[in-house]
Every structure is written in C-alpha cells, then in structure tokens.
C-alpha cells in the first residue's frame, strides 16, 4: 500500500531457507536507499554498517511502530509505523523500536527476510504465543508475531498470549 501511495514504508525482501530455517536474507528499500543483509551466524548490516537490536529491559515505555494503541497498552510509546511488517521489524534490528507485535494471520514470505535480519542483530522473533516460527511449511501461514528486544520478550508474550489465544479460540 505504501508503494501505491508514494510513501517510503515499503521494501523488496528476499530470503533463502534451508529446510525450515532462514539462512540468508536481504531487504532493499528503494525510497530510503537502505539495504539490509544478514547471513545466519554472521550478524546484520544496513548499507554495510553492523546493526545491533534494542537492549531494552523494561516493557513499559517500549517503542512500538503503530498508528494507535489499545487502552491496555498505553504504557507503551508509539513511533512512526511503516506499512510493511518487514520494515517495522528492521526498526527493532537497528534500535529504532523495541517491539513489533501483531495478532493476525500472515504469510511467511512477508517476514522471512526480516526475521533473520532482526535475529542476527540480536532481537527475538516468535509467533504471538512465544512459539518458534518455522518456514517452508505446507501451509505457509503463522498467527501473530513478536519481534523485540530480548529483555522484554517474556513480558510481550505475557501481554499478548491471552489475546492471541482468545482470537484463535
């Protein structure tokens, strides 16, 4: 949608999987001329500069790229939200956000590259209940996403798990 509207919050992303795991990822945002690259076990770079994810320890006050927060989450801090979930995940990878979370079904190809980019920068990436996300499944869908600083992952899961389970039934 951002591409169609002439906004900057979109990118092209490519990921290489071996089995159920992403081992190489690249994302390019043409408008901002940012190129993220990650190799499993070798870290993440953006335009050649090594990235390090947020090291936040306190959940309250965490920076979240969103347009609005539910009343129960008003202890969090809103920051600019690009439309692309992958671009939001790179915000955690480069310490411009502390938490990206969704409670909806999504295709693995939308997050595969950003998943490795965020993890190799030091972030934690799981589904909305804290479970591992596997790739190359027969049904390439997962419910929800948490991408965040390691120090707030448990609190994020605690905050979202009940909501996720209520949606899933």
State each model region's role.
Residues 23, 51-52:
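Local beta-strand/beta-hairpin segments that build beta-sheet-rich folds
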Residues 52-169:
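An extended, acidic
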Residues 1-45:
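DPxDG-like acidic metal-binding loop motif
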């Amino acid at each position: 949608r951002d591409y169609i509207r002439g906004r900057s919050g979109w990118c092209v992303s490519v990921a290489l999987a071996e089995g159920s795991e992403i081992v190489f990822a690249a994302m390019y945002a043409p408008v901002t001329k940012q190129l993220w690259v990650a190799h499993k076990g070798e870290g993440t770079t953006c335009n050649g500069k090594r990235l390090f994810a947020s090291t936040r320890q306190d959940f309250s006050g965490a920076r979240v790229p969103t347009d609005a927060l539910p009343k129960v989450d008003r202890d969090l801090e809103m920051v600019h939200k690009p439309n692309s979930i992958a671009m939001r995940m790179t915000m955690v990878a480069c310490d411009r956000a502390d938490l990206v979370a969704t409670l909806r079904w999504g295709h693995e190809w939308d997050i595969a590259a950003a998943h490795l980019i965020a993890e190799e920068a030091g972030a934690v990436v799981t589904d909305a209940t804290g479970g591992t996300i596997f790739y190359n499944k027969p049904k390439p869908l997962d419910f929800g996403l948490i991408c965040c600083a390691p120090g707030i992952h448990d609190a994020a899961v605690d905050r979202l798990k009940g909501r996720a389970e209520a949606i899933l039934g």
